[in-house]
Regions:
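A ubiquitous, low-specificity "background" feature that marks scattered single residues
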Residues: 8, 184, 356-360, 377
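Sec-dependent, cleavable N-terminal signal peptides
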Residues: 1-21, 364, 377-378
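A detector of low-complexity, intrinsically disordered, Ser/Thr/Gly/Pro/Ala-rich segments
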Residues: 6-7, 14, 68, 77, ...
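Residue-level hotspots at or immediately adjacent to binding/recognition sites across diverse folds
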Residues: 20-349
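Intrinsic disorder/low-complexity segments
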Residues: 8-16, 69, 127, 175, ...
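A short, hydrophobic C-terminal helix/tail in secreted or cell-surface proteins
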Residues: 350-371
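Membrane-interface capping segments at transmembrane-helix boundaries
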Residues: 371-377
Length: 378
């Protein structure tokens, strides 16, 4: 995997050198040479603030299939408990891969979503697990949009899960799944009709309303202008509001692809997000991860974002991605020099609310957009 040099136009955005307070490796300890992808995080209710649930994906060395992962413990040190958690199937189909995303705290356990594959098809089929984090005694529910080729659930909160499905491989659609009703609906936006769009992150506000984050494209080409978005969602009406599109650095010329992968509250009335972006002149094999902060205006709309570019430090390291976020922590993957993808946790510096719209560099690196889960081929 080649190392990408930032285009001059993109590098010009990174005017200030600012480094994360810390980066720590955070991988499944039983990987034994395999790769670890961290995909989701949520705090443990009633516990210390550093206690979290993490979802992930583990690829055993030499295997083409994946296994789901869950973790419970501290986010500041890899000292908690890891569990391999795989969809068991219905006794008829042979399960070859499981991938888990977006855990949620149920008090006495967790709810985690994702997808699985069988030995007879390359298609992804959505799935949801509810029960102990260990997987012992829990229940599984298949999630599949009618008529879809692939269905992947990315995250869940409250009574909703969000994700993507496709009916043709070059166009993905975002869905909202009502867990209590067991029903799917398309996520749509007022005044905009994308050719392809995703829903990766969901947050439930204290008043019961939801905020969803992801990405969209107005062009049919996968190399077209992609943007991230945030939108409010009313579960009672199924309507969205306060849609706002984002380009990394607030510049669609130098950032041709921007995508939000995760969202969390900032503890006030704003949100912290993470994701990936690609600079002008780069292919989809190259780009960077980021951390972003978005506030609320007096009229309820979302503000401009403050952006921090992320890269796992180390001579010769390859790509870094931002997959999920909790408080001031970003989780994702990096590729060590000569190695396979591994998980990391980055602690980002405090946000200066007076510098919204600025871009700070947290190291420079490259990104292969590994396991982006953006439904281009899945």
């Amino acid at each position: 995997m080649k190392r990408i040099v930032l285009a001059a136009t993109a590098a010009a955005l990174l005017a200030t050198n600012c480094f994360a307070e810390s980066y720590i490796p955070f991988s499944y300890p039983d990987a034994a040479g395999g790769s670890t992808y961290l995909t989701g995080v949520r705090g443990v209710s009633g516990g210390p603030s550093d206690q979290v649930y993490i979802s992930g994906v583990y690829t055993p060395l030499g295997s083409a299939g994946t296994q789901g992962l869950t973790y419970q413990g501290s986010i500041t040190s890899n000292t908690g408990s890891w569990y391999a958690l795989n969809y068991p199937g219905d006794g008829v189909e042979t399960i070859t891969s499981t991938a888990l995303y977006g855990p949620n705290n149920l008090g006495a356990g967790i709810r985690v979503v994702g997808s699985y594959k069988t030995g007879t098809s390359a298609a992804d089929i959505g799935v949801m697990y509810e029960g102990p984090v260990s997987g012992i005694g829990g229940t599984w529910t298949k999630l599949q949009v009618s008529g879809s080729i692939n269905t992947i659930a990315h995250s869940n909160y409250g009574n909703l899960a969000v994700g993507n499905y496709d009916t043709q491989l070059d166009e993905g659609r975002a869905f909202v799944y009502n867990i209590n009703a067991g029903s799917f609906s398309d996520l749509t936006f007022s005044g905009i009709t994308p050719t392809s769009w995703t829903a990766y992150g969901i947050w439930q506000n204290p008043n019961g309303s939801y905020v969803i984050a992801g990405g969209f494209s107005l062009t049919p080409s996968v190399t077209g202008l992609d943007q991230g978005y945030i939108v409010d969602y009313d579960a009672a009406t199924g309507l969205s509001s306060n849609f706002r599109a984002y380009n990394f650095g607030d510049n669609p010329v130098t950032s041709v692809v921007s995508h939000f992968d995760g969202i969390t509250s900032d503890g006030h009335d704003g949100f912290n997000l993470t994701g990936d972006w690609i600079g002008a002149g780069e292919s989809e094999e190259g780009g960077l991860a980021f951390f972003a902060h978005v506030g609320r205006s007096a009229d309820g709309s979302f503000t401009a974002a403050e952006w921090l570019s992320l890269s796992y430090p180390g001579e010769g390291n390859g790509p870094t991605s931002g997959n999920t976020v909790y408080e001031k922590y970003v989780l994702g993957i990096y590729v060590p020099d000569g190695g396979v993808p591994q998980g990391y946790v980055a602690t980002v510096p405090e946000i200066d609310p007076n510098s919204l719209g600025s871009v700070l560099a947290l190291g420079l690196g490259s990104l292969g957009l590994l396991e982006r889960r953006r439904l281009k081929t899945a």
